[in-house]
């Protein structure tokens, strides 16, 4: 298979690339990684080609997406708080760049599997207790609006046969390795990751805030499953809420002490930030997993296992 990953130097792009290259049931002949900084090929694998490219002005992209391209994972984006602070950059990066790629697919290879990483931020406002696949999106942030626009565009391009698109809405990913970023949800990983490394972290939200989470490894496994799904009927809705589980910040901290003891909480300071709390609180905290599980997507069993997974794979 020939596969393209945008956002290829990001945390998810790198983990997805490494996992794809190690797969036995997906044979990768050519893996192209694209980002605004030149990505690094995992393990210097000779099957990987890396390109520095700004997808707002994608000169040369039509030479990388060809008739031989089997799939594109479009992960590149600027994150929620950054898009809120700089909406013009957000619309150019998160929406117009997506349309640029879709137009190249339409011209060069309308049969390509186009997998788009969407977000819980497409929801907001007064939500039902449990989100269904039929729940309308009502974003309350610029980032969420941009993701919702992309979802509609990809579904329309899929309906018209311009691409073979699948939109996967990601739960909040926890625990991410590395450093905090500008995402409103960055604290979700930070309040676990930093204390596990013996460092201090700030929790800017209420302990009662409920979140919808998935581990990095499960999200990557679900990306690869989306690659292998049969094409959906042209007139069906090509958006899937990836499975997750519901947990409060308080429960997360309790599970952390179960794994590492009460003393680890000394590394966590509570400094309430109304802006961050309001953004994250507007996202759904419970989603009906029925359809996604029926399609074969995976879900984590509990949060303690997520902590153990981070300790095993990322420390």
From Swiss-Prot:
Gene Ontology terms for molecular function: oxidoreductase activity
Source taxonomy: Bacteria, Pseudomonadati, Pseudomonadota, Gammaproteobacteria, Pasteurellales
Binding site for NAD(+): 119, 143, 147
SUPFAM superfamilies: NAD(P)-binding Rossmann-fold domains
This protein's encoding gene: denD
Active site: 143 (proton acceptor)
Record has Oxidoreductase as a keyword: yes
Keywords associated with the record: Carbohydrate metabolism, NAD, NADP, Oxidoreductase
Statement: the UniProt record of this protein carries the keyword Lipid biosynthesis: no
Described purpose of this protein according to its UniProt entry: Catalyzes oxidation of D-erythronate to 2-oxo-tetronate. Can use either NAD(+) or NADP(+) as cosubstrate, with a preference for NAD(+).
Organism, scientific name: Haemophilus influenzae (strain ATCC 51907 / DSM 11121 / KW20 / Rd)
Similarity remark: Belongs to the NAD(P)-dependent epimerase/dehydratase family.
E.C. number: 1.1.1.410
Protein name (database record): D-erythronate dehydrogenase
Catalytic activity: D-erythronate + NAD(+) = 2-dehydro-D-erythronate + NADH + H(+)
InterPro entries: DenD, Epimerase_deHydtase, NAD(P)-bd_dom_sf
Main EC class the enzyme belongs to: oxidoreductase
């Amino acid at each position: 298979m020939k596969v393209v990953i945008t956002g290829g130097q990001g945390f998810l792009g790198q983990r997805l690339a490494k996992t794809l290259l190690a797969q036995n049931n997906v044979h990768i002949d050519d893996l192209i990684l694209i980002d605004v900084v030149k990505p690094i090929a995992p393990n210097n694998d000779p099957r990987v080609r890396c390109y520095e490219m700004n997808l707002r002005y994608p000169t040369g992209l039509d030479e990388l997406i060809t008739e031989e391209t089997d799939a594109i994972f479009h992960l590149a984006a600027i994150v929620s708080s950054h898009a809120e602070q700089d909406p013009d950059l957000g619309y150019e990066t998160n929406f117009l760049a997506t349309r640029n790629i879709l137009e190249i697919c339409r011209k060069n290879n309308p049969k390509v599997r186009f997998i788009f990483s969407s977000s819980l931020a497409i929801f907001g406002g007064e939500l039902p207790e449990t989100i269904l696949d039929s729940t309308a999106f009502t974003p309350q942030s610029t980032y969420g609006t941009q993701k919702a626009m992309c979802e509609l565009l990809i579904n329309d391009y899929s309906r018209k046969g311009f691409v073979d698109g699948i939109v996967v809405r990601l739960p909040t990913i926890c625990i991410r390795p590395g450093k905090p970023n500008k995402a409103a949800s960055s604290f979700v990983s930070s309040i676990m990751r930093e204390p596990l490394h013996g460092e201090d972290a700030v929790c800017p939200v209420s302990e009662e805030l409920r979140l919808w989470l998935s581990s990095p490894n499960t999200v990557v496994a679900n990306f690869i499953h989306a690659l292998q799904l049969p094409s959906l009927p042209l007139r069906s809705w090509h958006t899937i809420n990836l499975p997750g589980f519901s947990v409060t910040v308080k429960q997360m901290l309790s599970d952390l002490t179960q794994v590492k003891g009460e003393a680890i909480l000394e590394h966590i300071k509570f400094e309430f930030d109304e802006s961050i709390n309001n953004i994250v609180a507007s996202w759904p905290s419970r989603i009906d997993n029925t359809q996604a599980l029926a399609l074969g997507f995976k879900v984590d069993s509990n949060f303690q296992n997520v902590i153990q997974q981070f300790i095993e794979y990322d420390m």
